[in-house]
From Swiss-Prot:
Name listed for the protein in its UniProt record: Recombination protein RecR
Presence of keyword DNA damage: yes
MF-aspect GO terms: DNA binding; zinc ion binding
Classification of source organism: Bacteria, Pseudomonadati, Pseudomonadota, Betaproteobacteria, Neisseriales
Family per similarity comment: Belongs to the RecR family.
Length: 205
C-alpha cells in the first residue's frame, strides 16, 4: 500500500474513532469491513451524513435535533407546558415517549458533567435552558438524569441552578438502577421513576 493510500486509510480510522466506544482497534476493523465488504453502503452512509449535517439542527425550544424550527413535541399544542423534563440526550426523550409517562415538554442538555474527561458546566446547555425558561409557563422542572457519577453531578449542578428560581424541582426516583443510563431502562421502570419522582424544592421564590 502506497504512503498516500496509507494516509487515506489512517484518516478513515481516525475519523471513525470519534464515535462513542470506538477505539483504535474497533475503528480499524470497521474501516476494513467498509472498504472490503460494504463499499456501496459506505457511500450511502456518507450521503446520509452529509444530508443530516445540512438539514438537522437544534430545536429552538428544547435543544433536541429536528429538521425545522421546532421539533414535533414542542410544536404540539396539546402538551402540558407547565412541566419541563430536563434530560441528557435525545434518546432519553424517545424512551420517555415510549413509556408514555410524561405529557409535558422537554429540554435536552446534549451533554453531562464528567470531571474525569474535563467536561465541566460548559458541557451542558445552561444558557439555552435559561432562555427556554424565559417564557414564564413552566411551573415544575423534572430532572431526569441517570443515576451515574456523571448524571448525579449534572443533577447537582441543575439543582443549584434552580435553587433561587421560582420553580418546583423534582428528580426521578431511584427505581432506576444505580449506574443505569435512561437509554437502557425498560418502559415500566421509567414510568414508575417519573410517577414517584422525588421533590427537591417547592415552587415559589
Amino acid at each position: 500500500m502506497s504512503h498516500k493510500k496509507q494516509d487515506a486509510f489512517q484518516g478513515l480510522i481516525d475519523a471513525l474513532k470519534v464515535l462513542p466506544n470506538v477505539g483504535p482497534k474497533s475503528a480499524q476493523r470497521i474501516a476494513y469491513h467498509l472498504l472490503q465488504h460494504k463499499r456501496k453502503e459506505a457511500e450511502k452512509l456518507v450521503d446520509a451524513l452529509q444530508t443530516a449535517l445540512k438539514q438537522v439542527h437544534h430545536c429552538a425550544m428544547c435543544n433536541t435535533f429536528c429538521e425545522g424550527g421546532l421539533c414535533d413535541i414542542c410544536a404540539d399544542e396539546t402538551r402540558d407546558g407547565r412541566r419541563l423534563m430536563v434530560v441528557h440526550m435525545p434518546a432519553d426523550v424517545s424512551n420517555m415517549e415510549a413509556a408514555n409517562c410524561h405529557d409535558g415538554l422537554y429540554f435536552v442538555l446534549m451533554g453531562q458533567i464528567n470531571t474525569a474527561l474535563g467536561m465541566d458546566v460548559s458541557a451542558i446547555a445552561l444558557d439555552r435552558l435559561a432562555q427556554r425558561l424565559g417564557g414564564g409557563e413552566v411551573e415544575e422542572i423534572i430532572i431526569a438524569t441517570a443515576f451515574t457519577a456523571e448524571g448525579n453531578a449534572t443533577a447537582y449542578v441543575l439543582s443549584e441552578f434552580f435553587k433561587n428560581l421560582p420553580y418546583k424541582v423534582s428528580r426521578l426516583s431511584q427505581g432506576i438502577p444505580l449506574g443505569g443510563e435512561l437509554e437502557y431502562v425498560d418502559a415500566g421502570t421509567l414510568a414508575q421513576a417519573v410517577y414517584e419522582r422525588r421533590l427537591i424544592k417547592e415552587g415559589g421564590a
